[in-house]
From Swiss-Prot:
This is Ion-translocating oxidoreductase complex subunit B. It holds the Pfam family Fer4_21. It comes from Pasteurella multocida (strain Pm70). Part of a membrane-bound complex that couples electron transfer with translocation of ions across the membrane. The complex is composed of six subunits: RnfA, RnfB, RnfC, RnfD, RnfE and RnfG. The lineage of its organism: Bacteria, Pseudomonadati, Pseudomonadota, Gammaproteobacteria, Pasteurellales. The keyword Chaperone does not apply. Residues 106-135, 136-165 form the 4Fe-4S ferredoxin-type domain. GO terms for cellular component: plasma membrane. Its EC number is 7.-.-.-. It is found in: Cell inner membrane.
Length: 198
């Protein structure tokens, strides 16, 4: 009698699970909300540093705001390049600025003599550009730093400062159109044929 009751309960639970699963599966297909594809495209253009300098909690909410008509010039780490790309995607004219090109990029710098190794800057960095361990010296990886300045306020010793990245021949962004590069062709076989008269 008890075994029959247990089997009945197990079968009833399994049937209910199948029914509710079918209802949820049907609802997920029929009631699916399609994401706005323009939001996804704008979000892909943003630098994904989630720094909040635009006034939004991350890049995805800012992309949604841009799709709803917000200003496209709020992404500081993205600079003029992101503004132009978003304007091109949205089919609008990029806003004119007083600054030619991108502003000078900034990166964080840790004065290692003052660093106490509290790891507060590591926790604040959205792109993991700071390395170090607890109670040990920390340092910045400049190639990863977006200059969002989120690591500066939590530092209890004020050992983090923002410095300009000086353009040198080694780190300058060489912008050129690969279509304009003239290929180098080996003409020695052609010259030999011309000399031999073939």
């Amino acid at each position: 009698m008890i075994i029959t009751t247990v089997y009945f309960i197990l079968v009833a639970i399994a049937v209910l699970a199948l029914i509710f699963g079918a209802i949820l599966g049907f609802a997920s297909v029929k009631l699916k909300v399609e994401a706005d594809p323009i939001v996804e495209k704008i979000d892909a253009l943003l630098p994904q540093s989630q720094c909040g300098q635009c006034g939004y909690p991350g890049c995805k909410p800012y992309a949604e705001a841009i799709a709803n008509g917000d200003d496209i010039t709020k992404c500081i780490p993205g600079g003029q390049t992101v503004i132009v790309n978003i304007a091109e995607l949205m089919g609008v004219e990029p806003p004119t600025t007083d600054i030619e090109g991108d502003p000078a990029p900034m990166v964080a710098f840790i004065d290692e003599d003052m660093c106490i190794g509290c790891t507060k800057c590591i926790q604040a960095c959205p792109v993991d550009a700071i390395i170090g361990t607890n109670k040990a010296m920390h340092t910045i990886i400049p190639d990863l730093c977006t200059g969002c300045e989120l690591c500066v306020p939590p530092c209890p010793t004020d050992c983090i400062s923002m410095i300009k990245v000086e353009s040198t021949i080694h780190n300058w962004n060489w912008k050129f159109d690969p279509k304009l590069v003239i290929p180098i062709v080996d003409t020695t076989t052609t010259q030999k044929k011309l000399i031999k008269g073939e």
